[in-house]
């Protein structure tokens, strides 16, 4: 079983895997439209993390992970818990960056529009301010944004994810409320 990562699964790999491969899926675009009250924000002050939205012309680069033989159910159960908060799973075709490898199916987690944490579209500046101000049990929301952008630049320099990179630039240039939010007590 293969799982596709397009957000924190790209840079925060805390599960066992047998193999990983850079590639893309088609028919979607990555957007910071999913609220996070369990990882990058808290109830009443959610952070924003990525989900995918259907886009016939879209292409999302990421990393596919092959789960270890005999541990698929255990690792999937862990990922189901990690990706809680409104995500559903579906299967899509993955196109490896290495074109000598044939496309294959991967499991994909998507935050749906009808889930309680879905925030939807907003002006880029508003999304940036929300990310700057949010912090949750997994850390600052800006860490999530900046790690994802850096990872995509390193893995796929040719990627032109305008939403991701514009949001990164806007967040770095937003003076706003740059006070350090207090981390939740553990």
Swiss-Prot record:
Chief place of localization: cytoplasm
InterPro entries: ChaC, GGCT-like, GGCT-like_sf
One biological process term in Gene Ontology: glutathione catabolic process
Ubl conjugation listed as a keyword: no
Top EC class, one word: lyase
Cited CDD domains: GGCT_like
Active site location: 83 (proton acceptor)
A Gene Ontology cellular-component term: cytosol
Source domain of life: Eukaryota
GO molecular function: glutathione specific gamma-glutamylcyclotransferase activity
Subunit structure: Monomer.
Database matches in PANTHER family: CATION TRANSPORT PROTEIN CHAC-RELATED, GLUTATHIONE-SPECIFIC GAMMA-GLUTAMYLCYCLOTRANSFERASE 2
Function of the molecule: Catalyzes the cleavage of glutathione into 5-oxo-L-proline and a Cys-Gly dipeptide. Acts specifically on glutathione, but not on other gamma-glutamyl peptides.
Name of the protein: Putative glutathione-specific gamma-glutamylcyclotransferase 2
Organism ancestry: Eukaryota, Metazoa, Chordata, Craniata, Vertebrata
Encoding gene, per UniProt annotation: chac2
């Amino acid at each position: 079983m293969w799982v596709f990562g397009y957000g924190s699964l790209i840079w925060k790999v805390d599960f066992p895997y047998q193999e990983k491969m850079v590639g893309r899926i088609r028919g979607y675009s990555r957007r910071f439209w999913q609220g996070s009250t369990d990882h990058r924000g808290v109830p009443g002050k959610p952070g924003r993390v990525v989900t995918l939205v259907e886009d016939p012309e879209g292409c999302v680069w990421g990393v596919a992970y092959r789960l270890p033989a005999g541990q698929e159910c255990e690792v999937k159960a862990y990922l189901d818990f990690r990706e809680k908060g409104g995500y559903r799973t579906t299967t899509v075709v993955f196109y490896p960056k290495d074109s000598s490898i044939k496309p294959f199916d991967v499991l994909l987690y998507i935050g749906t529009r009808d889930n309680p944490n879905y925030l939807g579209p907003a002006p880029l500046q508003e999304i940036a301010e929300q990310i700057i101000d949010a912090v949750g049990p997994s850390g600052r929301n800006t860490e999530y944004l900046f790690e994802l952008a850096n990872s995509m630049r390193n893995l796929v320099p040719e990627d032109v994810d305008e939403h991701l990179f514009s949001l990164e630039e806007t967040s770095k240039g937003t003076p706003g409320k740059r006070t350090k939010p207090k981390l939740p007590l553990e």
